[in-house]
Regions:
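Membrane-water interface segments that mark the loop-to-transmembrane alpha-helix transition
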Residues: 14-26, 52, 61-117, 128-135, ...
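Interfacial segments at transmembrane-helix termini and the short loops linking adjacent helices
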Residues: 12-13, 112-137, 260, 324-357, ...
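Helix-loop junctions and terminal segments of transmembrane helices
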Residues: 63-80, 273-298, 367-368
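Hydrophobic alpha-helical transmembrane segments
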Residues: 51, 135, 164-213, 381-385, ...
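Signature of the first transmembrane helix
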Residues: 11-68, 72, 101, 108, ...
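Transmembrane helical elements of multi-pass membrane transporters/channels
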Residues: 15-34, 167-174, 191-210, 223-289, ...
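Membrane-interface junctions at transmembrane-helix termini in multi-pass inner-membrane proteins
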Residues: 74, 143-165, 293, 351-378
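Interhelical loop/hinge segments that connect adjacent transmembrane helices in multipass membrane
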Residues: 1-13, 118-129, 161, 188-195, ...
Length: 433
């Protein structure tokens, strides 16, 4: 068994700790600011903002063409040839942002987004003016895709300091601006203020940090890189679309059957439940390039199995602390007491996010073997199950029923990922023996 000292000397662990320390500061500060926003916004406003934020985040996972998987893979393959690497970066960025501009124009011409939001607005317990939020929701979507593209570029290029600087500056500038304006505003729509200030500021910061990326590109479009990226990424975009039934469907059913005030509490619980997933992502950001670059399959499997056990144990323990801490914060009125309902369904949401982390972890195998169509098939099955469970549980059991449903779905998907990933690596090991 490895000693604690030898673990700390491992280069992957050391880089993880370096990135994790910044993430702890950034994410920790964002979570510490949750009570500030809870007191600056009404429960209804907090619910509407959370709903719009999750809608934009879900759309970003659908419209990003799966670059978060294609970019690290192609970067490693082209890293030894600077011109190939530079043209690959240019090809992926032009393809992604050209596609995004086309989709934005299409939505503005057809008004398809209005048809979606009218479903929620027909509910008696939900009322908000989507028309006023629309321009800033599109900016938020563009900013999310832009910032994640930069993040995965920095990860692929192993520019850890760039990630740290970007995250720290974004945290300070965006939060200071938003909190100041919300505090000074009295009768203004606080959902609109928070949405607009946060993502206009973030988008401008992305433009500043994109300078280091622009310096690396070579303006030569390569069709072969575009096709490779689409082969890897398009199944993931489809997975994002299908997964939206599970990952955004819970918020949609909460808004439809419980209203925007209940969505405020559910949004708070969902934010707290993402902590285990965020902790995992700090590790995965550093682990992924090393995972994709490992040539010895037996070593890869051994490391992967060991890390999976550690991740599961750490995240379950962390979840217990989060639930207990949330209970204390409610008792001390740091979280307003009208959010007390979260203690009943937060455990299930935490469990669902622990297994969501494992889903992402085992997804690395499908990227490694370029078998990203497998998660696509699994996601379709999960979406059908999710819609069925939400439909049966939402009206009768509310948030408790929905949170239990999403936990069951994520556990089932994790088990399928483990089965298929082990099948492929065992098959490849036998073929190379």
């Amino acid at each position: 068994m490895l000693s604690f000292k030898s673990l700390l000397q491992n280069p992957v662990i050391k880089k993880s700790l370096s990135l994790f320390s910044t993430d702890v500061l950034v994410r920790g500060a964002n979570f510490l600011l949750i009570p500030v926003f809870l007191h600056l916004m009404t429960k209804n406003d907090f619910g509407v903002y959370g709903y719009l934020y999750n809608f934009a985040m879900t759309c970003s996972l659908i419209l990003n063409l799966g670059y978060h998987s294609a970019l690290p893979k192609l970067y490693i393959e082209t890293s030894e040839n600077r011109k190939d690497n530079a043209s690959m970066l240019f090809t992926l960025s032009i393809s992604l942002f050209g596609f995004l501009a086309f989709m934005f124009a299409l939505f503005y011409i057809t008004d398809a987004d209005y048809a979606f939001f009218n479903i929620v607005n027909n509910s008696e317990d939900v009322q908000f003016d989507y028309r006023s939020y629309r321009p800033y929701l599109f900016i938020a979507l563009a900013s999310m895709i832009f910032s994640n593209f930069l993040t995965y570029y920095f990860i692929s290029a192993k520019k850890i300091k760039n990630i740290q600087a970007f995250n720290l500056i974004r945290m300070f500038v965006c939060n200071i601006a938003v909190i100041t304006v919300l505090y000074l505003s009295k009768d203004t729509d606080k959902v609109l203020l928070r949405l607009s200030i946060t993502y206009v500021t973030e988008f401008l910061l992305c433009c500043v940090f994109a300078r280091s990326f622009i310096k690396e590109i070579w303006c030569k479009y390569r069709k072969d890189y575009m096709l490779r990226a689409l082969k890897i990424g398009l199944p993931l975009s489809f997975v994002g679309l299908v997964n939206s039934v599970v990952n955004f469907g819970d918020k949609q059913f909460i808004m439809l059957y419980c209203g925007s005030e209940a969505m405020g509490a559910y949004n708070l619980a969902s934010l707290l439940a993402t902590i285990p997933l965020i902790v995992f992502q700090s590790f995965n950001f550093v682990w992924l390039p090393n995972f994709l670059g490992e040539k010895n399959l037996q070593t890869l499997k051994k490391k992967n199995d060991r890390n999976a056990k550690i991740i599961l144990s750490v995240l379950l323990l962390l979840s217990i602390f989060i639930w207990f801490g949330s209970y204390l914060l409610l008792q001390w009125n740091i979280f307003p007491r009208n959010y007390g309902e979260i203690t009943s369904y937060l455990p299930m949401l935490l469990l669902s996010q622990v297994f969501a982390a494992l889903i992402l972890y085992y997804f690395n195998y499908f990227t490694y073997f370029e078998k990203t169509h497998i998660p696509m098939v699994i996601s379709v099955c999960g979406a059908f199950a999710g819609y069925l469970l939400y439909s049966l549980s939402a009206e009768k059991f509310g948030a408790i029923g929905i949170s239990t449903s999403i936990a069951v779905i994520n556990i089932a998907i994790t088990l399928l990922y483990i089965i298929f990933s082990n099948h492929y690596i065992d098959k490849r090991i036998k073929a190379t023996a």
